[in-house]
Amino acid sequence: DIACKGSIKELLDYQFSTNEIAAVVAERDVEWWQNRASVLTTPQLASGYFNAGFLLINIDEWNLNNISSKAIEMLRDPDWVSKITHLDQDVLNVLLNGKVKFISEKYNTRYSINYELKDKVDNPVNDDTVFIHYVGPTKPWHEWADYPVSRSFLIAKAASPWSKEDLLKPVNSNQYRYC
């Protein structure tokens, strides 16, 4: 549920530091980080917790550190599962703790299309935004998501093999309430 809106050149040129596994974008604020650190019994997360919607991964370091295997092991452990509320995001924050670099929010600008239904909306998507991360139940591939913030997705769709595919119609009461 991410659409590219800007140039990815800086990401293509990105050089990972020694032992750095990923470049990530912070999630929420310090209060949230402290909450996740406490719940996940990982005190270091109090200094930074990332959103897993966007990850620039150093594949060599990822594989060297067996991140995929360790993630699956964590998800099989009932003690960990009882703490996890944000599935892959919680797991990756624990496993990659201290091995990530926090980069600009322009690479994961989160926005819910449903905010458009409010009287006043503060849209963080701007000219600097590289990736729009569509959070919330309405996505730009839904036919009722006819808002300017959907434009980046629609441009990409028009240039894709799916250009002739219809946007999705509402199929349940939750979706109907937003159209």
Q: Where are the language model's segments positioned?
A:
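A glycosyltransferase accessory/donor-loop signature
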Residues: 45-47, 51-179
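A generic local structural motif
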Residues: 8-10, 41-42, 118-119
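Surface-exposed acidic, glycine/proline-enriched linker/cap segments
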Residues: 29-45
